[in-house]
């Protein structure tokens, strides 16, 4: 009794982002009940823009287009565009038809851009002023229009034809005399992006220059929108998550709880198949050296650690390089420098761990002469080779315009399995005269 009223009071004190986080951990039936309470507040639009797409599709099944139009009328146009992109096409079109013409045209303008470009991320709600205005007049306009713009930290100065001319921060505006014209106090060296700039590059620009928003211009350099830092934070998090998931062969969707078991299995299968192929080929190599293995059975005991050390250092190297490529800290002009540096790292670590394992083999299997030497050299060679392969593969894939995050993992693990086992037995055959 009174539970709904208490829940309503609690929701009114809760940020929509926190509501969305809790919402995703509820059952389907619980979500329906809680949303019915959320629907009694004016936070529905903010809440819908925060929740996961899979949950959004669950919720809208029970909502009418007329109700959704009322909700999105209070939302920012870029959030509306994102919402409509997530909905089934038929439902999205029905909602668009019911929208006010001016709002519909604004949203349609945003939806024409790819969602992973500056055009797809931008908000058309920005503060643009004519350069002929005085600082005093500009302050009055900002006060009158502050609720209309996405962010008032920056004021963008345009020519009469709408072309971007400069930028000035709100702080700088307040510090200048009210009679000074904007064109005389603005910063004309504006960092901007175009509507088709990839979201990765937009994120790089904002983080590189430590700005809160970046203006978006069209092919004629007309100011059409801004991308704000809050949107870019989401992009950076999503891109980093996607890269790490793809490196592990787990697809690019981190919402494993919202996907079916079969979907998760199918997503991971190709990467695991590549590892399986590498394991099978390594098995055939071991079988090929069956006679040598029978003569020195102790060789079998060290196969896992030799291959494991190679696989681990290859993963480290490839992860460092892939992340470096993504952040722009590693480029193709330094290809040989990067490869030789990681090769030296592999050589140092291979020497250290090869020495340790060689001593272990020497004292643990004293009856087999030179086994310690075989194991030590194998670890040294395999770790050096693995560090080189782990560095070389993502750089070459990048040069060939392949997605290094996706292709590196399977290729590297398969290569190390095959080359590591082969090198181990060839070294053993040579040093032990098998």
Task: Show which residues each predicted segment covers.
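Juxtamembrane "helix exit" motif at the C-terminal ends of alpha-helical transmembrane segments
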Residues: 36, 276-293, 356-367
């Amino acid at each position: 009794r009174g539970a709904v009223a208490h829940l309503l009071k609690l929701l009114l004190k809760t940020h929509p982002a926190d509501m969305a986080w809790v919402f995703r951990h509820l059952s389907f039936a619980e979500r329906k009940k809680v949303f019915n309470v959320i629907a009694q507040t004016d936070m529905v639009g903010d809440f819908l823009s925060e929740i996961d797409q899979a949950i959004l599709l669950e919720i809208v099944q029970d909502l009418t287009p007329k109700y959704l139009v009322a909700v999105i009328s209070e939302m920012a146009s870029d959030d509306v565009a994102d919402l409509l992109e997530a909905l089934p096409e038929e439902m999205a079109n029905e909602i668009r038809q019911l929208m006010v013409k001016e709002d519909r045209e604004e949203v349609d303008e945003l939806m024409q851009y790819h969602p992973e470009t500056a055009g797809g991320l931008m908000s058309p709600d920005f503060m643009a002023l004519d350069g002929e205005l005085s600082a005093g007049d500009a302050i009055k306009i900002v006060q009158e229009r502050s609720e209309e713009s996405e962010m008032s930290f920056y004021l963008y100065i345009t020519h009469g034809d709408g072309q971007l001319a400069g930028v000035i921060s709100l702080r700088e505006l307040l510090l200048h005399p009210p009679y000074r014209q904007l064109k005389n106090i603005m910063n004309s060296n504006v960092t901007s992006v175009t509507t088709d700039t990839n979201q990765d590059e937009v994120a790089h620009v904002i983080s590189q220059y430590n700005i809160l928003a970046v203006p978006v211009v069209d092919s004629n350099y007309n100011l059409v929108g801004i991308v704000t830092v809050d949107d870019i934070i989401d992009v950076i998090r999503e891109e980093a998550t996607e890269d790490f998931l793809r490196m592990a062969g787990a697809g690019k969707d981190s919402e494993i709880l919202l996907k079916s078991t079969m979907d998760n299995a199918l997503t991971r299968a190709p990467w695991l198949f590549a590892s399986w192929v590498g394991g099978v080929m390594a098995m055939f190599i071991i079988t090929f050296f069956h006679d040598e293995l029978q003569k020195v059975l102790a060789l079998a005991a060290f196969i896992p650690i030799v291959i494991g050390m190679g696989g681990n250092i290859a993963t480290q190297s490839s992860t460092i390089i892939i992340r470096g490529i993504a952040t722009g800290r590693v480029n193709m002009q330094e290809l040989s420098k990067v490869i030789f540096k990681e090769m030296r790292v592999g050589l140092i670590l291979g020497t250290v761990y090869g020495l340790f394992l060689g001593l272990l083999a020497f004292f643990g299997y004293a009856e087999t002469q030179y086994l310690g030497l075989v194991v030590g050299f194998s670890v040294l060679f395999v770790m050096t080779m693995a560090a080189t392969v782990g560095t070389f593969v993502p750089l070459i894939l990048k040069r060939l315009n392949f997605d290094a995050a996706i292709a590196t993992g399977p290729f590297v693990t398969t290569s190390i399995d095959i080359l590591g086992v082969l090198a181990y037995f060839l070294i053993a055959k040579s040093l032990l005269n098998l």
